[in-house]
């Protein structure tokens, strides 16, 4: 049980790239090399049946680079779902859970929902949805992240 880690991070809307109100939370659990993220979102700005793309992000050179983790499907009054990945190979990259700065959720119609756990402010205008790979020793030992829609 020594590798067990669990925390909750609150999700905020970022209308016009400014932090708005709290709209939900994500519970992140890591154990035995696997990471599970449980999302609960209540945002009237998310239209039903809208796809929400979830990215983990890391910070490099003043920018935030995304690692695609999966998609959630917005419900009528709320959005909930689970995403799974390896704790030491987030989104099949060489990035670990400990290196992530937080999560950014993008919805084409409504914009950005985000959380951070590295204690640095989120600036959506500096987000790039793809991580540029730097030369680093890595092993592709993960499986593709899966999702569960509820």
List where the protein language model places each region.
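N-terminal targeting/export leaders
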Residues: 1-150
């Amino acid at each position: 049980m020594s590798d067990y880690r669990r925390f909750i991070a609150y999700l905020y809307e970022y209308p016009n790239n400014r932090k708005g109100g709290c709209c939900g939370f994500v519970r992140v659990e890591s154990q035995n090399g696997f990471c599970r993220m449980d999302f609960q979102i209540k945002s009237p700005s998310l239209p039903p049946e809208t796809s929400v793309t979830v990215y983990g992000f890391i910070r490099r050179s003043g920018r935030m680079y995304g690692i695609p983790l999966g998609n959630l499907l917005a419900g009528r009054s709320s959005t909930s779902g689970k995403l799974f990945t390896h704790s030491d190979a987030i989104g099949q990259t060489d990035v670990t859970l400990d290196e992530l700065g937080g999560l950014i959720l993008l919805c084409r119609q409504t914009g950005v929902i985000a959380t951070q756990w590295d204690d640095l402010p989120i600036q959506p205008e500096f987000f790039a949805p793809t991580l540029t790979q730097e030369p680093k020793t890595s092993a592709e030992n993960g499986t593709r992240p899966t999702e569960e829609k509820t």
